[in-house]
Amino acid sequence: MLIESADHDADLVTYEPDELHHVMRFALGCWQQMIDSQQYRSVLMYKNKGPLSGGSLVHPHMQIVGLEQEDGYVSLTSANFEGINVWQQGRAEADLFADAIQVALRYILNEHHGGRAESYNLFFYHLGGRTIAKALPRWVVSPYFVGYRLAQVNAETTLDVDAERLRAHLETLV
């Protein structure tokens, strides 16, 4: 568990740039240190925020979990990362990476679906020599998914509009 701030109401969304960069550099460094230790089969890093995120701790935190037996990536395929590519910046430095994450999270909480999301998950992956962040708004899970594993997805046009709006925010970073 990585506690981000002494401020109980703080979050990646609200941090000033210096604090955001410090937290993200520290988290990425701790994650890499656990990976480099070779004590674990895989090391996962993620963040839960909000009442629908699946987390239990309200204080701002990320979780870095070392799995001794399990491969946390075993069920991931390239299909998990398909869709509309909103932003890709080659080998972005950690501070720019943090800024992009903050922009995406602000978009999720303040603009996506009219700003109705109050929860999100943020996942980090090392894949293909790259570090990838995947931010997702969290909602009450549909009974279609719970009972039948059928996902309800937005229409392509809605996804395209969301992607374009978020892309416009991210393009201000470079």
State where each predicted segment sits:
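HIT superfamily nucleotide-processing domains
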Residues: 1-174
